[in-house]
Structure formats: structure tokens, C-alpha cells
């Protein structure tokens, strides 16, 4: 009995020691915090500088210009850098990679992106500070996260704490509109993941005390229907049938009734054209239709998106959609095609354990526990491409609101704290 009590007491003390270590900063970690604090204003000024360079995905020169700013900054902290060009026919700027190659601790892959949804013709172009809020196009999604990465690493470098670390930074140039084929546009990112132990994504934070252990994947779909062009007086007759628009209506209604409802599975028809003739421009996501009320529609097309938490869920949904499309109304035809975009990042045990390490850092800094964010409320991101190869977290970037809108903001009150947390977290991971 006495031996059992001693054994149980030793386990308790061991766990208590781990808890206390999680709640206390070491002397070195306190120096890291102080160093980050010394760069607080500089980090905000750098954020303003890169925000004021338009880098909409299709503004290739703008994306490269933002990449050059980060390239120069990483070189000053002794990272080797390279720009990965994309083939001209892909019409994408390319990606920035920066790395140091030591042999201590976990091999880290830090992911961001240089492009934004705000193209060169957007009226929202400049950084404007109002007290602790910065109105910033692409500042929250996600130049703020890129700056978090840079200044966390800068603090560690200045304290000579990166000497033996192995870290790769990957800032893609087409996250908002991924270049196709993905086998080319994401090859270097995936290769970097295969050589790493952990991937950390710095997409916008969903809350100071949240991080992302899972993200839904994204896929495109297109339904095309065909009907018999005829005078509308004969619609529904055996000779004329229902027409292309009624067939499309049937399909979309059955999608809603029969595919909808599974947790984390959503699908959305984004645009719909129908009539005698339709013309759709994919690059502009717009089109036109011509038809008359006294003519049965001969064609219709809808483009949509599908979001899912696993490949199994995606394929099951696709199978249901195909079966629905195949069951035609009289004298109509229909086809459905799918386009892969982002894979899913599943909520693995390893990701949950990594979240606990981040939470320990947060508590040690006095910021409180970090919990997992609901994947059903997040979109897709680049970290999903590497989730099959490494454990990871996302949502570690800047806080703000209004992403992808003319009211996009960065919360400067929390900006420095997030850099502190990242710097200490990276330090601990490179010492594991």
C-alpha cells in the first residue's frame, strides 16, 4: 500500500511539474518577450509598408514586390531565400521561400501568403490607422500573419536562438486564387512539408484564444443541363419535355433536400445562367444569358462550391450529387463535373497535442488557454495541402475583422502579443 501511495504521489508531482513549467517562462523566454516588445512599432510600420503595396493575386508585379520586401527582411536575419517562378501560362506570380538549416529541435514549416483578394482596381488600397485599429486591405488576410512570422523570427535571431534551428518559411503568391494545376503550384510547398516535422499556418486568427486544428477542404462543381428548344406552348408535353431550366431546378432542389445536413458538409451554387443561349467567362466569374418567355430553355449552367472535412465525406457527397443529376426530367439531359481545389485538414490527435503546447505557451505568458476553433466556420487554406504529411496548426496570424471586405481591419492591440506568443512557441519547438 505504501509503495502504491509513493507511486501515485510521484505521478502527481511529475504532472504538477509539467503544469508549472507550462505556466512559467524561462529566463531566456523572458528575454524573447522583451526583444519582441522592442520591435512593436517597427513591426506595425513594416505591416503598413507591405499593405500599401497592392498584391491582388492577379497583380503579379505587386505580389512580387511584396515578396521582395519580405525577401530582403529575411536575408537580414540570415535566412537563405529563393523565389519560385510559376509557368507563364499559369498567370501567377510565384512563391517566396526562406530557410535556415540546423539540426536541433523540430523541423518547422511556417506558411503564409503574399497575395490578397484586393486587385489593382479595388478602391480599398491603403493602410489607415485609427487608434488601435488599422484599416488595411489584405492586412488581416494575411499580411499581418506574415509580419507575425517575420518579427517572431527576428527576435529569436537577435538573441542568437536560431543558430541550430531548421525552419522553412513558405509565403505563396496565389492562395486567394490558386494556380492550376495544383501539382505545379503547390509542389514546392508539399516538398517542404515532406522535409518537416510540423507545419504552422499564420492565416488570420479567429480569436486570441483560438487556433485551428482542422480546416475543411474546398472543391468546385458545375452542372450543365440541356432541353429541347421549342415554343413554350408545348412545355411539359411528351414531345417537348420540361426544358433545361426546370431540369436545373430539379437538380438543385434535390441537392438541397438529399445531400444537405451532414456535419461540416456544405455546398453552394454561386451563379446560375439559363435560357436559349448562355455565355460564361470563368476568369471573371460572370456571364450573360438570352432567352424569351415563350421559348423553352435549351441550356442552363450553374457553378458552385463544395466544402468537406475529409476525402471520404467529399466523395460520398459527390456520389449523391452524380446520382441526382443522372435522373432526368422528360426530354432533358444533365452532366456534373468536379474540380479539386483544397484538400481537407483533419482534426488529428497530433494536431490536438500541438495545440496543447501552444496553449501552454499562452498560459505561461498570461494570455490564457487556447482552444480549438470550429472547422465548420473556417474556409480552406494552404496548410491543407500539407496536412497529410505533418502535424500542424493554423489561425496563428493577426486578429481583425472584415476579411475580404472594404472594412478589413487589423487589431493592433493584440498584434504584439501574438508575435510574443509565436516567438516563444517557436523557441520551444526548436528545443524539443
Residue ranges and their predicted role:
Residues 23-137, 157-162:
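Acidic/His- and Gly-rich active-site-bordering loop/insert found
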Residues 119-129, 214-218, 282-287:
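Short, flexible, mixed-charge acidic loops at enzyme active sites
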Residues 142-218, 277-284, 430-432:
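Acidic/histidine-rich catalytic neighborhood of metal-dependent amide-processing enzymes
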Residues 86-89, 211-215, 292-295, 374-376:
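Short Gly/Pro-enriched turn/cap motifs at secondary-structure boundaries
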Residues 110, 130-180, 221-225, 234-258, ...:
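Alpha-helical metal-binding/catalytic segments enriched in His/Glu/Asp
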Residues 118, 161, 213-217, 293-297, ...:
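Short glycine/proline-enriched loop/turn "hinge" motifs that connect secondary-structure elements
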Residues 1-25:
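Bacterial Sec-dependent N-terminal signal peptides
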Residues 23-31, 45, 55, 73, ...:
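Metal-dependent amide/peptide-bond hydrolase catalytic core
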Amino acid at each position: 500500500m505504501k509503495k502504491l501511495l509513493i507511486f501515485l504521489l510521484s505521478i502527481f508531482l511529475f504532472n504538477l511539474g509539467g503544469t508549472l513549467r507550462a505556466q512559467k517562462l524561462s529566463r531566456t523566454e523572458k528575454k524573447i518577450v522583451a526583444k519582441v516588445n522592442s520591435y512593436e512599432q517597427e513591426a506595425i510600420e513594416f505591416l503598413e509598408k507591405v499593405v500599401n503595396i497592392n498584391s491582388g493575386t492577379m497583380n503579379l508585379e505587386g505580389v512580387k514586390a511584396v515578396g521582395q520586401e519580405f525577401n530582403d527582411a529575411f536575408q537580414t536575419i540570415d535566412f537563405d531565400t529563393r523565389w519560385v517562378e510559376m509557368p507563364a501560362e499559369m498567370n501567377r506570380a510565384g512563391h517566396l521561400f526562406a530557410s535556415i538549416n540546423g539540426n536541433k529541435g523540430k523541423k518547422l514549416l511556417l506558411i503564409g501568403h503574399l497575395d490578397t483578394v484586393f486587385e489593382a482596381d479595388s478602391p480599398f488600397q491603403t493602410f489607415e490607422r485609427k487608434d488601435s485599429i488599422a484599416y488595411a486591405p489584405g492586412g488581416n488576410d494575411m499580411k499581418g500573419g506574415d509580419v507575425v512570422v517575420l518579427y517572431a523570427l527576428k527576435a529569436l535571431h537577435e538573441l542568437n536562438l536560431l543558430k541550430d534551428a531548421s525552419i522553412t518559411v513558405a509565403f505563396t503568391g496565389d492562395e486567394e486564387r490558386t494556380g492550376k494545376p495544383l501539382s505545379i503550384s503547390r509542389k514546392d510547398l508539399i516538398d517542404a512539408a515532406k522535409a518537416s516535422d510540423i507545419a504552422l499556418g499564420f492565416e488570420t486568427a479567429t480569436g486570441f484564444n483560438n487556433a485551428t486544428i482542422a480546416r475543411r477542404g474546398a472543391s468546385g462543381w458545375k452542372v450543365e443541363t440541356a432541353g429541347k428548344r421549342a415554343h413554350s406552348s408545348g412545355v411539359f408535353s411528351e414531345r417537348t419535355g420540361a426544358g433545361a431550366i426546370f431540369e436545373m431546378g430539379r437538380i438543385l432542389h434535390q441537392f438541397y433536400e438529399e445531400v444537405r445536413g451532414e456535419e461540416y458538409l456544405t455546398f453552394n451554387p454561386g451563379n446560375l445562367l439559363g435560357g436559349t443561349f448562355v455565355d460564361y467567362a470563368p476568369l471573371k466569374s460572370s456571364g450573360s444569358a438570352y432567352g424569351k418567355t415563350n421559348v423553352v430553355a435549351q441550356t442552363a449552367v450553374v457553378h458552385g462550391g463544395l466544402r468537406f472535412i475529409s476525402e471520404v465525406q467529399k466523395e460520398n457527397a459527390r456520389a449523391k450529387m452524380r446520382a441526382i443529376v443522372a435522373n432526368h426530367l422528360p426530354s432533358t439531359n444533365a452532366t456534373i463535373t468536379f474540380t479539386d481545389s483544397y484538400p481537407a485538414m483533419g482534426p488529428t490527435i497530433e494536431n490536438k497535442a500541438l495545440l496543447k503546447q501552444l496553449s501552454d505557451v499562452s498560459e505561461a505568458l498570461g494570455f490564457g488557454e487556447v482552444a480549438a476553433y470550429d472547422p465548420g466556420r473556417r474556409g480552406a487554406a494552404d496548410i491543407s495541402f500539407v496536412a497529410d504529411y505533418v502535424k500542424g496548426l493554423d489561425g496563428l496570424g493577426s486578429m481583425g475583422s472584415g476579411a475580404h471586405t472594404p472594412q478589413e481591419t487589423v487589431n493592433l492591440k493584440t498584434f504584439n502579443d501574438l508575435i510574443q506568443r509565436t516567438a516563444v512557441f517557436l523557441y520551444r519547438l526548436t528545443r524539443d
